[in-house]
């Protein structure tokens, strides 16, 4: 019991001390042999270097494995059991040979399997059990197919003053960068014209932000909405013409027979949305069922019977399973229905997360987003990532935290990947760069053209972060 407690306590202390050492590259392909050059950055790490140098000079650069902790060790997260025990127990890190070059520790390792790996540093023997004398740095290995992709953060559901939002469409470019977004869509109600100004202004700024044409599609007064992303034109209907009514009627008649007890207006809304979704898909758009469980004061807009039917229909490429502008309760209830359908049918339905922000005061524009794992940020890559299940719906529960702690929903391997990126501080570094860009873009929007070179310089800095954080053969 005491041994297991020691293992848990040590893990907690290690987790709290993650910033003593730095390593630029943190994500690797599985079964990768590499040389790590780890920098000592904190006072503790500098003291560690002093101790390590003294021990090297004295020829005592390792402790005895199994009795004392090594000066530098390796620990793999999936090592839950000892060789002889069938319960969680203390596993000592494997000693590693290392070299000291200036303030860097140079270590050769083989990172086996798909796993989280820890390089552990110790100053004193474990027999003394002084937990403050351990530090570590974590690495991630992913399968070779997943390693081909890079993480990008974006928000494809938000509104401008072209519909019911507060901001001018082009203003979304600055706030997207402040929020750390790599791609966005400004999806106004009944509107497509806003897209050109956003796309043009983003291209003018050259910050690296990618903008997809987007629209929130529905008919007048409809309770069921969907997102069209990447279409060449708008597909919403501003008024129900005889021709449109004729196109909808066959679908409405089917639904009335299938759901005789459902509200007829709700069924009409679904029939109309189905027609719009099919038109947008024919136009090459990615179509998403958005905010399934949203409410208007006292009632839910889509009954749970209808939510269930809509998701099962697979008329949409994906479901917006987290929406930043509706309550946590509504998001949870939508997720519960979604989860039950996936379990019951054995179907993997793609998900996204979006802010649905109408102004910047609420902070929703940066709190809820989609993480995609793709080769780049083009619309073709985004659409493929969503349909292939390489997206995660994310909601940042505590914006005030020094290190993001979002909730991620999606395929398990991408959720684990997303969690590692949070823990490793990737998005902190990423958002620090894009945040500076966003503030400069606001100045540029106000007429200060002198900031463009600095925006471009920051874009190059972001490119370097992406290149360095992920392993490249030969670097």
Q: What are the residue ranges of the model-derived segments?
A:
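A metal-dependent hydrolase metal-coordination microenvironment
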Residues: 145-290, 320-324, 328-337, 381
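N-terminal signal peptide c-region/cleavage motif recognized by signal peptidases
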Residues: 15-17
């Amino acid at each position: 019991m005491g041994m297991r407690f020691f293992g848990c306590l040590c893990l907690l202390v290690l987790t709290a001390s993650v910033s003593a050492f730095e390593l630029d590259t943190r994500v690797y392909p599985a079964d990768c042999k590499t040389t790590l050059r780890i920098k000592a950055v904190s006072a503790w790490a500098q003291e560690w270097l002093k101790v390590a140098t003294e021990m090297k000079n004295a020829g005592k650069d390792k402790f005895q494995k199994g009795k004392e902790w090594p000066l530098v060790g390796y620990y793999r997260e999936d090592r839950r059991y000892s060789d002889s025990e069938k319960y969680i127990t203390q596993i000592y890190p494997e000693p590693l040979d290392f070299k000291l070059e200036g303030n860097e520790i140079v270590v050769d390792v083989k990172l086996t399997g798909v796993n989280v790996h820890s390089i552990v540093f110790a100053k004193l023997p474990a027999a003394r059990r002084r937990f403050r004398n351990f530090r570590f740095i974590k690495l991630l290995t992913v399968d070779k197919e997943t390693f081909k992709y890079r993480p990008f953060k974006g928000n494809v559901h938000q509104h401008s003053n072209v519909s019911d939002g507060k901001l001018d469409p082009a203003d979304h470019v600055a706030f997207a960068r402040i929020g750390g977004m790599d791609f966005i869509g400004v999806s106004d109600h009944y509107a497509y014209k806003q897209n050109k100004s956003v796309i043009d202004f983003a291209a003018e700024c050259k910050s690296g932000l990618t903008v997809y044409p987007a629209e929130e599609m529905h008919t007048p007064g409809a309770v069921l909405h969907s997102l069209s992303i990447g279409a060449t034109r708008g597909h919403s209907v501003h008024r129900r013409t005889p021709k449109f009514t004729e196109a909808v009627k066959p679908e409405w008649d089917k639904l009335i027979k299938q759901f005789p007890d459902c509200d007829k207006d709700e069924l009409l809304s679904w029939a109309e949305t189905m027609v719009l979704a099919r038109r947008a898909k024919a136009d090459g758009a990615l179509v998403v069922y958005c905010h399934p469980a949203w409410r208007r004061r006292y009632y839910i807009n889509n009954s749970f019977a209808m939510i269930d039917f809509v998701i099962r229909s697979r008329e949409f490429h994906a479901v917006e399973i987290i929406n930043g502008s509706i309550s946590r309760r509504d998001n949870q209830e939508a997720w519960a229905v979604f989860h039950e359908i996936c379990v019951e049918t054995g179907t993997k339905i793609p998900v996204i997360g979006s802010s649905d922000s109408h102004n910047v005061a609420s902070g929703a524009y940066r709190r809820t987003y989609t993480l995609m794992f793709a080769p780049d940020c083009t619309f073709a890559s985004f659409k493929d990532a969503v349909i292939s299940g390489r997206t995660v719906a994310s909601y940042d529960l505590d914006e005030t935290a020094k290190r993001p702690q979002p909730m991620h929903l999606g395929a398990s391997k991408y959720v684990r990947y997303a969690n590692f990126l949070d823990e490793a501080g990737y998005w902190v570094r990423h958002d620090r760069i894009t945040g500076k860009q966003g503030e400069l873009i606001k100045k540029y929007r106000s007429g200060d053209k002198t900031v463009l070179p600095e925006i471009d310089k920051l874009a190059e800095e972001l490119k370097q972060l992406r290149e360095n954080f992920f392993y490249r053969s030969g670097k």
